[in-house]
Amino acid sequence: MDKARKLELIKKFGRSEGDTGSPEVQVALLTERIQSLTEHLKVHKKDHHSRRGLLMMVGQRRGLLNYLSDQDIERYRTLIKELGLRR
């Protein structure tokens, strides 16, 4: 993920200008990294080190999504719809 794509995601999902810490932004950035790493692992099937990193990122995203669903269910539903996440 390059700097321009990262800024684009922050602008789209941030609650204000320069908002990088909100759960929505963190989940969006993690989702982008997860998708990129998933494509990498389709080609490099034996890269177990990266696979572990992927699983850790998925767990971190799951925790942020759980937090967001507890805090504000509407923001949670909007986010998973925009990102195309299941559940």
Curated annotation (Swiss-Prot):
SMART domains: Ribosomal_S15. One of its GO terms (biological process) is translation. The keyword Transmembrane helix does not apply. Signal peptide: none annotated. GO terms for cellular component: cytosolic small ribosomal subunit. The keyword Nucleotide-binding does not apply. Keywords: Ribonucleoprotein, Ribosomal protein, RNA-binding, rRNA-binding. GO terms for molecular function: rRNA binding; structural constituent of ribosome. It holds the Pfam family Ribosomal_S15. NCBIfam families: S15_bact. Belongs to the universal ribosomal protein uS15 family. Part of the 30S ribosomal subunit. Forms a bridge to the 50S subunit in the 70S ribosome, contacting the 23S rRNA. One of the primary rRNA binding proteins, it binds directly to 16S rRNA where it helps nucleate assembly of the platform of the 30S subunit by binding and bridging several RNA helices of the 16S rRNA. PANTHER family: RIBOSOMAL PROTEIN S15, BACTERIAL AND ORGANELLAR, SMALL RIBOSOMAL SUBUNIT PROTEIN US15M. This is Small ribosomal subunit protein uS15. It comes from Clostridium beijerinckii (strain ATCC 51743 / NCIMB 8052) (Clostridium acetobutylicum).
